[in-house]
Amino acid sequence: MADRTAPRCQLRLEWVYGYRGHQCRNNLYYTAGKEVVYFVAGVGVVYNTREHSQKFFLGHNDDIISLALHPDKTLIATGQVGKEPYICIWNSYNVHTVSILKDVHTHGVACLAFDSDGQHLASVGLDAKNTVCIWDWRKGKLLASATGHSDRIFDISWDPYQPNRMVSCGVKHIKFWTLCGNALTAKRGIFGKTGDLQTILCLACAKEDITYSGALNGDIYVWKGLTLVRTIQGAHSAGIFSLYACEEGFATGGRDGCIRLWDTDFKPITKIDLRETEQGYKGLSIRSVCWKADRLLAGTQDSEIFEVIVRERDKPMLILQGHCEGELWALALHPKKPLAVTGSDDRSVRLWSLADHALIARCNMEEAVRSVSFSPDGSQLALGMKDGSFIVLRVRDMTEVVHIKDRKEVIHEMKFSPDGSYLAVGSNDGPVDVYAVAQRYKKIGECNKSLSFITHIDWSLDSKYLQTNDGAGERLFYKMPSGKPLTSKEEIKGIPWASWTCVRGPEVSGIWPKYTEVIDINSVDANYNSSVLVSGDDFGLVKLFKFPCLKKGAKFRKYVGHSAHVTNVRWSHDFQWVLSTGGADHSVFQWRFIPEAVSNGVLETTPQEGGADSYSEESDSDFSDVPELDSDIEQETQINYDRQVYKEDLPQLKQQSKEKNHAVPFLKREKAPEDSLKLQFIHGYRGYDCRNNLFYTQAGEVVYHIAAVAVVYNRQQHAQRLYLGHDDDILSLTIHPVKDYVATGQVGRDAAVHVWDTQTLKCLSLLKGHHQRGVCALDFSADGKCLVSVGLDDFHSVVFWDWKKGEKIATTRGHKDKIFVVKCNPQHADKLVTVGIKHIKFWQQAGGGFTSKRGSFGSAGKLETMMCVSYGRMEDLVFSGAATGDIFIWKDVLLLKTVKAHDGPVFAMYALDKGFVTGGKDGIVELWDDMFERCLKTYAIKRTALSTSSKGLLLEDNPSIRAITLGHGHILVGTKNGEILEIDKSGPMTLLVQGHMEGEVWGLAAHPLLPICATVSDDKTLRIWELSSQHRMLAVRKLKKGGRCCAFSPDGKALAVGLNDGSFLVVNADTVEDMLSFHHRKEMISDIKFSKDTGKYLAVASHDNFVDIYNVLTSKRVGICKGASSYITHIDWDSRGKLLQVNSGAKEQLFFEAPRGRKHTIRPSEAEKIEWDTWTCVLGPTCEGIWPAHSDVTDVNAANLTKDGSLLATGDDFGFVKLFSYPVKGQHARFKKYVGHSAHVTNVRWLHNDSVLLTVGGADTALMIWTREFVGTQESKLVDSEESDTDAEEDGGYDSDVAREKAIDYTTKIYAVSIREMEGTKPHQQLKEVSMEERPPVSRAAPQPEKLQKNNITKKKKLVEELALDHVFGYRGFDCRNNLHYLNDGADIIFHTAAAGIVQNLSTGSQSFYLEHTDDILCLTVNQHPKYRNVVATSQIGTTPSIHIWDAMTKHTLSMLRCFHTKGVNYINFSATGKLLVSVGVDPEHTITVWRWQEGTKVASRGGHLERIFVVEFRPDSDTQFVSVGVKHMKFWTLAGSALLYKKGVIGSMEAAKMQTMLSVAFGANNLTFTGAINGDVYVWKEHFLIRLVAKAHTGPVFTMYTTLRDGLIVTGGKERPTKEGGAVKLWDQEMKRCRAFQLETGQLVECVRSVCRGKGKILVGTKDGEIIEVGEKSAASNILIDGHMEGEIWGLATHPSKDMFISASNDGTARIWDLADKKLLNKVNLGHAARCAAYSPDGEMVAIGMKNGEFVILLVNTLKVWGKKRDRKSAIQDIRISPDNRFLAVGSSEQTVDFYDLTQGTSLNRIGYCKDIPSFVIQMDFSADSKYIQVSTGAYKRQVHEVPLGKQVTEAMVVEKITWASWTSVLGDEVIGIWPRNADKADVNCACVTHAGLNIVTGDDFGLLKLFDFPCTEKFAKHKRYFGHSAHVTNIRFSSDDKYVVSTGGDDCSVFVWRCL
């Protein structure tokens, strides 16, 4: 058989010719070592100009396109393109990878930048969103990411003087970014009038917020802050591509070929025009500049690098040049000298010196060059062109000899014949033309058999033959020079070839993988001397093969560097070098060849990673010298760990079936049983596909795993403690080096690893999110801080975790085949080794990734499948055990030697202090010294060695050993057969536990009299187990076939076993020897049962659809039951032994009579009365309820009823064991369910006395023993069973407030939608009518009257410059809770309303504000830890809401957390240490998230509940425990690493208690939790069990609770009618046993408290109605601090004409008068209906209020008594006005009318006129100063003027122009056209008001903005200032009488804002 191994020689990259100047910029720098760093293709190059040497970084796998230099000038970051691109940070000294950043960007990484201290790296992606990311690059951790821009970003730069500030620029934009927490927020640069909006190409930041940027037009734009302040015009005459900042100043380079230097203030120093220099040329374009001291670097578009010394700037040196843009295909080497020539689509031919690494000549052609060839004497050079012509040049002076064009298509291949007389030219037309050199290249022959383009040609040594390859994959031969085809095989065989560059033919068939496309290898070249072949392919690889290379799929060595296609490879004339060309990367690589003799079989590992790569994984064919896989290993690799359905699919399946069957009326479901189960003991150990999964704890207990359970086994007591946290098969287990912690990994779609404590069995951390299918190997690092895991995905990913935090540190792809073991290096925490199928790799962590080296075997051994590995005591020594039985000894990555240890694979190895212990398939344990030089002792595992204290029997001698460990003077061994043995060092062995081997277990039978059971499995064994405290296997027998069922006879002496081949046998139950056997059926026997009493009959059911009945005494078949339409699943006898009940796979329930087997049809009602001997069936009305809602997917495999008929146990395909109360009638009965089995529970049986349940688990091979806990014994210890889900019927009642809050939908609010239903064209889109006479500029006419009456003429006209928020009246209580707190020991309070966080000083009443939120704040919490005093967190509504953490005193934002709680965050809370924050969203899943807020990192997140969660709070003494309550929701959470685990509250059997809607939480000592319920009870929990009720703590829902940290007292607040005894606020003792009630004295019928907080002797209370009240604990006196409007939009607003007062009128049915100076409520009146508008009379004595129901009221201001009222309309009054002369009242309504009333006629209020012809509802009205006219704005965006009081419309523009208005509140009209914004299509400007001075107008809109404009405001989109604070809609706005204040009202935020005018 031909040799398929890789060659022993190697290549090493020596030089790269080229620099990537196209489509990149800023990619050329000086390092600290004065070397030049740049990139080309996929290689980072460090070029030392002094020594003319290069170093290479080869860590990328595709084109590098971006590069950044770390501030230390040594570290380099490079980014690449690709589907999953990554960033490498590497050291320019030793070109080692320091960190890898991956898994975030797609498409490519376009820009990179380090910040000034080098800690953070910013990167920009090439994806559609141009994502910007910030990395903590050393950790490989993403800190923040954000959408960059809609178009390309070209450059990014950090501000060196301000941390966390960054600038990016690109197509038509520049953005200024700030990083806060995990939020990256951008503000766009404002170009203004200073410069044109245009594309910015490069940036540099300077001090004092100055940013310099280079623009596409050649200008430098200078920015201060966000604003463009000046431009330096014509800095370059075309686009500026590069801008470099350094100590000396700035350097710029542009498309005009100039470099300009500027000083630190950007004053010009000098200019260097490279086009004008010696090497310059027209069109030279600079892409990158770098300035260091006296030197400059410039990189050009055409791949040159210039170095300029500043003193001699007219003499730039060209230090590097390569081919320009255009594909590079042509390559030829000089036949006699170390020269190479290349030709490219850039139309140049270049001659390179291989010895000097330099370009010696360049010749430009007219056409693209695609092939070149030297004549044999080296004097002539032929070039094949893209246009089908070829040119021959004289090499000496590069002059043309001939130019011939015979073809149209490109010439891709040409070669001179070895004797120099002919030139063969192959074109894409198909033929090869032959030309005679001596006859001036006359064409003398043509080879034309090819049907496709010619790819390769080779001449024979004697120049008589030619072979060709073409695009169709054909290989043809021709006689030369005629071109006659040659077909004789014999003749062809003997031809010696002068060169071999063809990719087809027997000699090179090994270069092709076994199954492949034909075209992906572009070029090969053979080195006959060393018998090696080099190839270049489409994947950027250069490979070395042996030559000839005959068998497909040969091994090779591969070399990376080229990014995409390697277009050509050639040997130099003396075989010293290989040259390769890259198509797209236009680079030429020069590789030094290291022959075998030099490398002498040992691969030197070059410093470059990714270099010297032996035995590539690409082609793992079983080649000559690798033995075939051992059968055990092969079997293991075939196991499939995928599941049809995973446990996490259950909720969805349930949901789907609910939706399908929603028509079914909801009947009362059966109650769950009272009794429960406890898992006591498991027989089994998973050895058949796992290893190293057996350990001693320090306490001497044994840990291992079986099914989904991890077992802690006590040897002394022969008892087990079980960790039940997993929900599927555990596949791997490892123990912590220091503590008794264990990590276990399981099967799963998103496979989890649990780290748990063996003492407490509590989960410490749960690691998820990075493995698919399963976790097959685990290991802790030596210090125990890290954990490494290997997954079962296709790449066998390796993940390195910080397990305590639950964060992944790094990941990488492991190997394409299974990895068996991973081990951490004991000395170096960042090094690992993995072994697996034909695999050993040594890994080094680098940031978020790993770099790896394969084990290098050299001549000491061959590549083997490795089964185990250990580090030695000495540094760098590694020992691995192979499938051959050898131990391989490694130093670093080199194999030193091998030692024969076992026959067959070495499956297990364990390192000791002074040696090793190994175990193999041969069943022998061997003790070795520390270098595997001597075997000190061997132990063979044999039956004879078993001690008497063994708990079972060995199935066979020398079982295969899968796990081994030492400790406590013993060797612990786990076998493939499922046995765990303990070997004493002196020799005796004790069997501790055992179970079935690989194969499904279905057969299970309990002995009728004794605590014994039998099991039978597909592993072809029958086993008998003792179930008393001994728990051991009594007997075992091997069977010829596997079995699926067994049964004891009624006296227990005989045991019947049904086998899978259709036979069955009856054995003696004691000796397990045959009594009789039959083989009557072909398909498997599925059930077997003896009839009752004497056991006269035996019924045998099979998959042949029959049940056979045998007479036991006569041993004859007496009857056959026919009639089932499918296979039989279960059978049961009745108690008389006459009737058989049968279940079939078609869900039939049938009855047959013994002995003949006659079929009976029995009505269900009758069947229920029959007494059955056993019940194992799953069908029929009495067990209808055991089928789950989604049972079309899952099946119930088994059921069994207790003897007393009360309890039915079932086992199903989800691994659940369930208990039901029998009979189980009606659908979907409730149950208790238990986990432990992994996927399927195949059988369940009660022991003869019903005290124990036995279950077997199918493929998990486990036999589990559960004890039944009766109701009586349960009270003492509550048991967790996963209860079935609770239902709606159980909620604790209904409350209107809770119902409202449940139904609140925040999404409608997020989007700014118009609050009024307007129609028509917006004002700024209407066409303007030109007024009749546009007045001439100078006119004799009288001056135009003022637009607006000036009220305060006496004062100087005052322009309002700014607004500042001064006070807010409002508190959001209606849908929030616990959002009101004391600060500074009760001196201040903090709360929120609208989008403002408010701090109010109680002594002065003054307020300060936090206004960074963009929409309604929904929650607020204060950090209680003294270290974080006054730290507040708030969050809001929004599609991607942010949580802001800020300092309450300075209002400085400390951190911002961008959340993915879509819709909004409705509760937040700090942990005990103040470092963590938990948030819960109003998204559909109600996600709960835990944050480390200072770092801005998300720790963990998980869906909380399907309905609203109201509160989530940390325990006051914990950072890991918290509680959430909500709609029928009560969960106790633990933060385990980065996972959230919860336990539901267990209510148990407490009488009055129901799981109901919970609204609030408080905490007590000793793990007590109090929760307030909707019905007014408080539930008291200990851990997660309910222990008592505080009945009716309040009469209504308990909305809020507060735990005082200093004394533990608890305050509750609820909804309650004030009575003598009760109150809505109560103060309780620590146990909530005694309380004191407080009245709030608000005068309301029902007080509803939403927030309480306790300070020093005071209780702070917030109510649903927006009041904030302080209650004295001693005096019980209450003091109202804030009395805002209640829920409802506020539309009515009017300011007093002369005093600092205003009135607001709201939909809450009240009107309130406020004092502007003292900021307090003066008076309020209840109107009984929603109010919509208000107006003062000009004398300020009366106020008119319009109502939503069409009524209006006039009140006297002083007393708020009604003066008069009237209702002439039935729909809302929108605006109301009293005329300046106090005569008329105008009332505008939704009925498109304005009514006029005469006030002088007294309180009768008769209507004296009205306006009709109004096109839509009225919005605003203004009277003229003389009370003769009124202007009306309408919902159709039309403004009309009417006469008063007749209502006639005024249409003459002339008249309208001359009116002076008393006030202006209209948003319509030419005077205010400028207030309408561009983006108003969905939202409107709602209100406006002009100052009394007439110089400003302020507006409020649907975006929640206040805007201040100049008045009049006649230009569209006028300039303005904007103010935030309101949330969505500003409904009304007014200036106070003296223009000192602006008052604005909010729609949804029910708040009144007062702004000071500055």
Swiss-Prot record:
Alphabetized, the UniProt keywords read: Cytoplasm, Cytoskeleton, Microtubule, Repeat, WD repeat
Pfam families with a match to the protein in the record: Beta-prop_EML (PF23409), Beta-prop_EML_2 (PF23414), HELP (PF03451)
Extent of the WD repeats: 59-100, 104-145, 148-187, 195-233, 235-273, 280-321, 323-362, 364-403, 406-445, 561-601, 725-766, 770-811, 814-853, 861-900, 901-940, 996-1035, 1038-1077, 1080-1120, 1191-1230, 1236-1276, 1412-1456, 1460-1501, 1504-1543, 1553-1591, 1593-1638, 1685-1724, 1726-1767, 1768-1807, 1880-1919, 1925-1958
Query: TM segments?
Result: none
**Where is this protein found?**
Cytoplasm, Cytoskeleton
Q: Where is the composition biased (Basic and acidic residues)?
A: 1322-1337
Which PANTHER family does this UniProt record tie to the protein?
A: ECHINODERM MICROTUBULE-ASSOCIATED PROTEIN-LIKE 6, WD-40 REPEAT PROTEIN
Function summary: May modify the assembly dynamics of microtubules, such that microtubules are slightly longer, but more dynamic.
Name-wise, this protein is Echinoderm microtubule-associated protein-like 6
Q: What is the lineage of its organism?
A: Eukaryota, Metazoa, Chordata, Craniata, Vertebrata
Q: What gene codes for this chain?
A: Eml6
